[in-house]
């Protein structure tokens, strides 16, 4: 299913993002002077299952999760430098059941162990001065996308 996700908004997914699902987030532009840009994968109960915070000013990408009214867990960080290539950066997230696999522009994968074992029902996109276009497209499907009709 294809969604158009505008900055400072979220989309409710038609079907849960669950194990064996893939979400491909694609931007039509890259703002090299952009600031902190965040994508959150949210459960139906609004728990943040996967928090991806891209912070170019700190040269870091942070991964985390938290219960709706809980505290953030320990941050997991990787360097930001050279993760995105203009003009059309992308982020791909694969749910493997016990962990998420995250790829930036089809580069090396990062693995984030799930701390909250729920399915995502929505994806949120937040920024004041986004690195990416508004909207971004979000394509959510199974590991093998359905074949077109014959």
UniProtKB/Swiss-Prot annotation:
GO cellular component: endomembrane system; extracellular region; membrane
InterPro entries according to UniProt: ConA-like_dom_sf, Galectin_CRD
Domain of life: Eukaryota
Pfam families: Gal-bind_lectin (PF00337)
Residues involved in a carbohydrate binding: 51, 55, 64, 75, 77
Outcome of swapping residue 147 to S: Reduces the stability of the tetrameric structure
Keywords, in A-Z order: Cell wall, Extracellular matrix, Fruiting body, Lectin, Membrane, Secreted
Effect in UniProt of substituting residue 72 to G: Completely abolishes carbohydrate binding
Localization in the cell: Secreted, Extracellular space, Extracellular matrix; Secreted, Cell wall; Endomembrane system
Coiled-coil segments on the chain, per record: none
Domain Galectin: 9-141
Subunit description: Homotetramer. Oligomerization is required for carbohydrate binding.
Function: Binds lactose. May play a role in fruiting body formation. Displays toxicity towards the nematode C.elegans by binding to a specific Gal-beta-1,4-Fuc-alpha-1,6 modification of N-glycan cores on C.elegans intestinal cells.
Protein name: Galectin-2
Organism, as annotated: Coprinopsis cinerea
